[in-house]
């Protein structure tokens, strides 16, 4: 059997089948995404612009490793980064543990590959974990959980692990109190960890929940003083913010992203990045490492 080709030549059926198989194989190979521009984002911090500058040596190296331009998606909230990744506006970035779990539940294409191994810094212990802490202003009458009944509590963001999930789901059970909105007179969202701490320092809130490493960043930035606060409660260890990518990217791009972060400690510029983010290295992580967050959601 034969058929007429566009070039005007006859081809055998076998030749035609071989060509069709080649087309199918090529289509399969192209089913992954290979964007000319890679977009990076991260959940908002006390100073997202400054924190982005910390990532510059890493992103510069990634440009060399991929041959692609990299753009930054400026976040407005935790949820905005999640939605940007789900909508393919962002290809890789840094989420919070809770926002990662939310993103993963909406799409299996969101894949965690690493996190920070933090250096010891004040109340932040060394390792790839942190704790949620409940803070009040030292010298105030709020020196126990019982004394906070009927007061104003500041959280960070509904999609923040330490500023939303743990206070709402974990803390009431651990402290044996009613839900937050029943125990406190008012629950407010500060929008960022530093703003939650500052709201307590400036008497705009009576207490706040904040991540231990974010609290120390606020202290180190000179915005508040560690000695000005009581720590009334702290959670068990929770894994640090996950580095994620969309696994629909082509393998060479995914490998370049992962390798760039995992070898960041091998260069002088990378060492400066680690110093800025108060970390000793970047360590691999997997989805199951965040099951503790999923379990908290069930409470």
Region locations from a protein language model:
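An extracytoplasmic/periplasmic, membrane-proximal ligand-sensing/linker region
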Residues: 32-40, 46-57, 63, 238, ...
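Acidic, polar ligand-binding/catalytic clefts
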Residues: 83-147
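Short beta-strand->loop
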Residues: 110-127, 185, 219-237
